[in-house]
From Swiss-Prot:
Belongs to the binding-protein-dependent transport system permease family. OppBC subfamily. This is Dipeptide transport system permease protein DppB. Probably part of the ABC transporter DppBCDE involved in dipeptide transport. Responsible for the translocation of the substrate across the membrane. Induction: Nutrient deficiency conditions, which also induce sporulation. GO terms for cellular component: plasma membrane. The keyword Cell membrane applies. The keyword 4Fe-4S does not apply.
């Protein structure tokens, strides 16, 4: 176990290094600087600003300064909002993004499992076709399109929910739904397929022959083994939810990290881009690691100390 943890730690560190390096390269291959579009800024002032933010240094020194800011987790002030530091933006935005993302994940997992189990137990019946039709529809519609439709129908037409901001629980309904539907549909399809296969296994028939209750057979024996494929893709789904929240936060004017990230790309605010990229990379890698551990704990055939 200790050897596995050490290997995973170095793998996580290497992954973060690759991601941050690619982010740095992509920022630098775009011609120009963040101050090119500033109106009324003369050349001397622009050069002073570039010197202040180390943008006129050789690339190797910029990269070293960039790595130093990552190691110390101090990304300095925003270029477009000098009075606001990147760390303060992360501190304000992360709780909002975390609340939105985790709520969507919980709803997606629970709803997807319920739909998948119902569809498997009523195989080739009305509930099966209805659940899988909803799943196909959920997979087919991108979350930003769904968000627009939800706003139009439930905020503009029916006026049941607010269309934007993030000040009370009722504001969470539409963005959470837009973010959770796609992953929920994927989980439902995987659960249904896996449950159908598990329910035909010999140990399920043995459990029925022993007189165990249907609830115990489904929950204790069938569902636990059917969860393996779901857990396998859960890390990817978590990543898609967290990164998908960028667009959702922008659409619903939610003051989370996604809002800052989208604005920083449009404004070429390098410190904010670096800070949000590194922060999200660390969160996603940790989530993938936890999913990997959960997979090993649920499947006794997997020995963590033998994994590479």
């Amino acid at each position: 176990m200790a050897r596995y943890m050490i290997k995973r730690f170095w793998a996580m560190a290497a992954t973060i290094l690759v991601i941050t390096t690619l982010t740095f390269v992509l920022m630098k291959v775009i011609p120009g600087s963040p101050f090119n579009e500033e109106r009324g800024t003369n050349e001397a002032v622009q050069k002073n600003l570039e010197a202040y933010y180390h943008l006129d240094d050789p690339l190797i020194f910029q990269y070293i300064f960039y790595l130093k800011s990552i190691i110390t987790f101090d990304f300095g002030p925003s270029i477009k909002k000098p009075s606001d530091s990147v760390n303060d933006m992360l501190e304000r935005g992360f709780p909002v993004s975390f609340e939105l993302g985790m709520t969507a994940i919980v709803i997606a997992v629970i709803s997807g499992l319920v739909l998948g189990v119902i569809a498997a137990l009523r195989r080739n019946g009305f509930l099966d076709y209805a659940a899988m039709s909803l799943a196909v529809l959920g997979i087919s519609i991108p979350n930003f399109i769904l968000a627009t439709l939800l706003i139009q129908q439930f905020a503009v037409n029916l006026k049941l929910f607010p269309a934007a901001t993030w000040t009370s629980p009722i504001h969470m309904v539409l963005p959470t739904a837009a973010l959770a539907v796609g992953p929920m549909a994927i989980i439902a399809r995987l659960t249904r397929s896996s449950m159908v296969e598990v329910l035909t296994q010999d140990y399920i028939r043995t459990a029925k022959a022993k007189g165990l209750s249907p609830f115990k057979i489904i929950v204790k024996h069938a569902l636990r083994n059917a969860l393996m494929p779901v857990i396998t893709v859960l890390g990817t789904l978590v990543a898609s939810i967290l990164t998908g929240s960028f667009v959702i936060e922008k659409i619903f004017a939610i003051p989370g990290m996604g809002k800052y990230f989208v604005e920083s790309i449009n404004q070429r605010d390098y410190p904010v881009i670096m800070g949000t990229t590194v922060f999200y990379s660390v969160i996603l890698i940790i989530m993938l690691f936890l999913v990997d551990l959960a997979y090993g704990l649920l499947d006794p055939r997997i020995k963590l100390h033998k994994k590479g």
